[in-house]
């Protein structure tokens, strides 16, 4: 009961329109950066397997830098340091750029690992049928690779949603920033931050459950495949004995 006594409904209702506008920006940034990083992650993964040594080293350096440094530092560097070199980026584009570069570096490694996990025998078999390298990649390797990493991709998208709150550091008008401003104006930090907390949870929780569901589906799929495979091997062994 003491918890609810600390919440002021009139302040919550007054703050709701402002915070919901911030939520729309949060969702917009998440969607846009998700599309960019998912797409660029594939391209960077292919680039890291390129025959060009310069391209491989350049992309490898980019991935190592962005995976080895905190996202907040990357964001601050893009917004506050690049102007010293004559590159001034407004808050929202700077936030989108930082998130995209950060998550592309991680997603490309997810893609690369999944591509390399596809058995080489399938690639050889496809080439033996006369398929070109590009066709093999699109029709044989990618469908199998992407299917196995869907839970991981969804998990990264949930993390991306949560990391949008850090854009408040560079004054992006997302949900966290608007909550901070309203809390500072009303001095009711408990009510405002509880609202922001609940809204983040309401948006992020379905994503977390989706990841759990997909992981369970993948486990069941692998289990059923292993049962079928073992049954086929048993039948084959019996046939050979006869």
Predicted regions and their residues:
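Transmembrane alpha-helices and adjacent helix-loop boundaries
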Residues: 1-242
């Amino acid at each position: 009961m003491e918890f609810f006594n600390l919440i002021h409904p009139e302040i919550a209702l007054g703050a709701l329109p402002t915070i919901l506008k911030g939520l729309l920006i949060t969702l917009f940034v998440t969607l846009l950066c998700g599309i960019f990083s998912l797409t660029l992650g594939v391209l960077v993964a292919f680039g890291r397997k390129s025959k060009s040594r310069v391209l491989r080293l350049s992309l490898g350096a980019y991935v190592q830098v962005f995976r080895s440094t905190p996202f907040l530092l990357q964001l601050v560097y893009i917004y506050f340091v690049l102007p010293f070199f004559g590159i001034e980026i407004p808050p929202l584009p700077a936030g989108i750029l930082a998130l995209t570069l950060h998550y592309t570096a991680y997603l490309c490694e997810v893609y690369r690992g999944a591509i390399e996990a596809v058995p080489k025998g399938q690639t050889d078999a496809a080439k033996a049928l006369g398929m070109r390298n590009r066709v093999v990649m699109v029709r044989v390797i990618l469908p199998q690779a992407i299917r196995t990493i869907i839970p991981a991709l969804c998990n990264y998208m949930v993390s991306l949603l949560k990391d949008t709150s850090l854009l408040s550091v560079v004054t992006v008008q997302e949900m966290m920033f608007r909550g901070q401003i309203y809390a500072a104006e009303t001095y009711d930090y408990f009510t405002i931050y509880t609202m922001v907390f609940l809204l983040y949870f309401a948006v992020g929780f379905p994503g977390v459950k989706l990841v759990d569901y997909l992981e369970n589906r993948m486990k069941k799929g692998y289990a059923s495949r292993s049962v079928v495979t073992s049954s086929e091997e048993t039948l084959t062994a019996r046939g050979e004995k006869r």
